[in-house]
Structure formats: C-alpha cells, structure tokens
C-alpha cells in the first residue's frame, strides 16, 4: 500500500495524520516508510533531529544518481523509516519544469525500492502543485484529512478535480480511501454542523473514526515521538489506531 495524505489546505492535521498512521502501521509489524514531500519538513522532524538529515527527498527526486534508499533514515520506532525533507524541497518544482517525466519522478524512485517496504505513507505539501501530483501518481490510495472548521470544504472542488485528472491518465489505479475529520470538538455546534456538511459532500467516503482535538497530538512531535509512545492512553492514540484499523479494512475490502 502506498497512501498519499493530501489536502491543499494547511492546518487540517495532514502531517499529524501521516506521522501517526505510519507509526500505527509500523506497530502492527509492517515495515513502513514515511516519505516527507512537504518543504516544511514537519513529518521529518517529528522523528529526526535536523542535524541528522544530510540528504533529503529533494536530492532523491532531483538527482538521477541519488536513490530513495540513499536518504532513508531509521526512527526509534521499530519498522518505521523516514525519507526526510528539507526546505530545499521548495525549489524542486522550478528544477523540474520542462522535464517530460516530471510527474513520474517519485513513482520511479519508489520502484527502485523493489518492494522493501510493505507500507509507504506520503505526507504531501498543502498545495496542488508538482510535489502533490508526484505523490498522487505514485500512490495506490489517497486519504484526505479535513478539519471540522468553518473553511473545511473550501477548495474541495480543486482537490477533486486534480485527483480526477490524475486518475484519467497517469494513475488510473488511484483509489480514494476516504476523508478523515480531524481536530474535531464535539462540544461546539459549528463542529457538528461542519461534520454534517462533510458527510453530505463525501458520503460513505468519510471514515467512521473522527480525530478529536487533543493537546497530546500537538505535543508529541516536540519529543520526536508518535502519539502511541508519547501518550499511549490518550484519546489521540485511540483515535489514530482506530483510523489505522479502518484504513486496513478498506484496503483489504478492495483487494479481495
């Protein structure tokens, strides 16, 4: 499974979802790779120190002689590895302009891993540019985090249009796993209303699991840990493990 975590809006829990879904998959004994395609590198520094990152996804994608395997680093969590990002990744789109295979760079690099990882999770940048398209072309599945806030559905049409364009030609096998509602505060009427709106737009694509707003989820990256080791008894850990279970169920349901 190669799952891209994408939403063109920032602040929707995209990186938190990528980090903790990857960790949950690894904890199930599956060798898992987290690929950071966001120049902000928040997924990377959720597990690694800056000074440990010598080469990044920029090098692996932009340089023909650099393999993805050359940049991958282990984390303290067994079975979890990271292909880290650096701020230089922001220059990649300009670097690849005009290259005929620009949309296939990541897909080709992943192919060189020869199935070493059972699961790959890709943290996309909050934009619908070349980096996100590379992730969608490489992925088998797409997961969309959506915060239960007033502007939750803003830009949804653009995202769905991009997904459809990718499915029409470069990656017809791409499947939308679903939409997960994040940072949900069930105490507020607004959050409940937005949740209903998301269900109206996406219907059965919405995961049953809802990620509640939880301070532990915000704190864990500062300690270079996933929520499962930082606060294993927290609501955040329960929610993300439940999401992982649902993801696996949906993937298996479509492959049997």
Give the predicted meaning of each segment.
Residues 1-256:
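P-loop NTP-binding core
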């Amino acid at each position: 499974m190669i799952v891209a975590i994408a939403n063109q809006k920032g602040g929707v829990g995209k990186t938190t979802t990528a980090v903790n879904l990857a960790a949950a998959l690894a904890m199930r004994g599956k060798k898992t790779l987290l690929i950071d395609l966001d120049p902000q590198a928040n997924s990377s520094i959720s597990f690694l120190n800056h000074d440990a990152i010598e080469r990044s996804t920029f090098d692996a994608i932009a340089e023909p002689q650099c393999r993805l395997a050359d940049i991958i680093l282990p984390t303290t969590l067994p079975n979890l590895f990271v292909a880290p990002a650096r701020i230089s990744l922001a220059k990649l789109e300009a670097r690849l302009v005009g290259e005929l295979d620009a949309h296939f760079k990541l897909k080709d690099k992943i192919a060189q891993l020869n199935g070493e990882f059972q699961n790959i999770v890709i943290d996309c940048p909050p934009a619908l540019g070349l980096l996100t398209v590379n992730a969608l072309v490489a992925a088998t599945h797409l997961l969309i985090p959506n915060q239960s806030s007033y502007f939750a559905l803003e830009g949804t049409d653009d995202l769905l249009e991009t997904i459809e364009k990718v499915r029409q030609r470069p990656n017809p096998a791409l499947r939308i796993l679903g939409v997960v509602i994040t940072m949900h505060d069930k105490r507020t009427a607004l959050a409940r209303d937005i949740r209903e709106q998301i269900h109206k737009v996406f219907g059965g694509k919405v995961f049953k699991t809802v990620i509640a707003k939880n301070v532990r989820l915000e704190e864990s990256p500062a300690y270079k840990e996933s929520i499962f080791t930082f606060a294993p008894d927290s609501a955040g850990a329960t929610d993300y493990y439940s999401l992982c279970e649902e993801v696996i169920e949906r993937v298996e349901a479509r492959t049997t």
